[in-house]
């Protein structure tokens, strides 16, 4: 079994990761860590997240400097479900040994260090680790992931958006001079577990935020290879992302070309499902899937694509497991999709 630990295990994403690794046929969940200052330190994970009660009885161990320096050679896999700054500070130590590090923060997703000052609010000083890091969009960068020591797991909005747009861009269907327009709504769990007025039950209302300045915009643009207009919204539901994307296509594009682009991109990727109707969040919440559907207006030359994911799974934890599967030579869906043969 492959020895695995999770740092930042008390949050929503960390708990989902623990659940997935606990049930995985090849990875073994050896330890769960939280900040030494965490109010959940020394509690059992199942006591913090009731749906795991009686399933995962591991304690949430306070992370000390001694433990931090030992993990790189004690573990085979380290998942970081930590704030950006913590991942940034700890990465050189955690990646210094045999362990492969899968970082679910945004600290190593982009190569331009200035982006972190502009969008994340901190100066990036880990140039060597940043150079090493590979972007973990599992259904697109599998070959890079297979040999990487540091994998930067994509953000939730970029996962939903890129899954819809990359087939079109790679097939050359998007018209030059026109920016794809992404409108996406996320559940409140995307804001994390920490209490805040803006995500409290009585305060949440459907609202745009981070308009023309959200940190996921440069991430989407960088890995799509073209600029986009991205507007995120906070919805009054727990989890899931629904992105509706409008794209101007080239004059000669027909429905067959669009269908071929998506089929070619995802024919061997069972995590991504091309639907025959508009996706809804109920179809993907609690699953590792990304559901896609589209409609083309040939007269106006516009294509509308909808992408639906669970922000905590395909947008975070299950995609991290996909990346770990690929890194250790397994099918990306191992432990995530249970195929039943008749």
From Swiss-Prot:
The keyword Isomerase does not apply. The keyword Amino-acid biosynthesis applies. GO terms for cellular component: cytoplasm. It is an enzyme of class 1 (oxidoreductase). Gene3D superfamilies: Dihydrodipicolinate Reductase, domain 2 (3.30.360.10), NAD(P)-binding Rossmann-like Domain (3.40.50.720). NCBIfam families: argC. This is N-acetyl-gamma-glutamyl-phosphate reductase. It comes from Pseudoalteromonas atlantica (strain T6c / ATCC BAA-1087). The lineage of its organism: Bacteria, Pseudomonadati, Pseudomonadota, Gammaproteobacteria, Alteromonadales.
């Amino acid at each position: 079994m492959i020895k695995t630990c999770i740092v930042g295990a008390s949050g929503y994403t960390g708990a989902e990761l623990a659940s997935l690794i606990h049930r995985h046929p090849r990875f073994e969940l050896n330890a769960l860590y939280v900040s030494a200052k965490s109010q959940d330190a020394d509690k059992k994970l199942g006591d913090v997240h009731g749906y795991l009660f009686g399933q995962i009885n591991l304690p949430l161990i306070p992370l000390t400097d001694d433990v931090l320096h030992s993990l790189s050679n004690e573990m085979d896999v380290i998942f970081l479900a930590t704030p950006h700054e913590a991942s940034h500070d700890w990465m050189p130590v955690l990646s210094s040994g045999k362990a492969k590090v899968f970082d679910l923060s945004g600290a190593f997703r982009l190569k331009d260090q200035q982006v972190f000052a502009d969008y994340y609010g901190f100066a990036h000083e880990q140039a060597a680790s940043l150079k090493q890091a590979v972007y973990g969009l599992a259904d697109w960068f599998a070959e890079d992931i297979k040999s990487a020591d540091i994998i930067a797991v994509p953000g939730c909005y970029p996962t939903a958006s890129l899954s819809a747009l990359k087939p079109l861009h790679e097939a050359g269907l998007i018209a030059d001079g026109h920016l794809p327009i992404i409108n996406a709504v996320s559940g409140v769990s995307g804001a994390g577990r920490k209490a805040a007025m803006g995500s409290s039950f009585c305060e949440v209302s459907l609202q745009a935020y981070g308009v023309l300045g959200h940190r996921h915009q440069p991430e989407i643009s960088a890995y799509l290879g073209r600029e986009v207009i991205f507007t995120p919204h906070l919805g009054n539901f727990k989890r899931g992302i629904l992105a509706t994307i409008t794209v101007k296509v080239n004059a000669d594009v027909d429905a067959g070309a669009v269908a071929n682009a998506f089929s070619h991109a995802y024919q061997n990727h069972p995590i991504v499902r091309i639907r025959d109707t508009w996706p809804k969040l109920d179809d993907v919440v609690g699953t590792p899937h990304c559901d896609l559907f589209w409609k083309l207006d040939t007269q106006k030359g516009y294509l509308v694509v909808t992408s639906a994911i669970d922000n905590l799974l395909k947008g975070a934890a299950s995609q991290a497991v996909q990346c770990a599967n690929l890194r250790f030579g397994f099918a990306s869906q191992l432990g995530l999709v249970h195929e039943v043969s008749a």
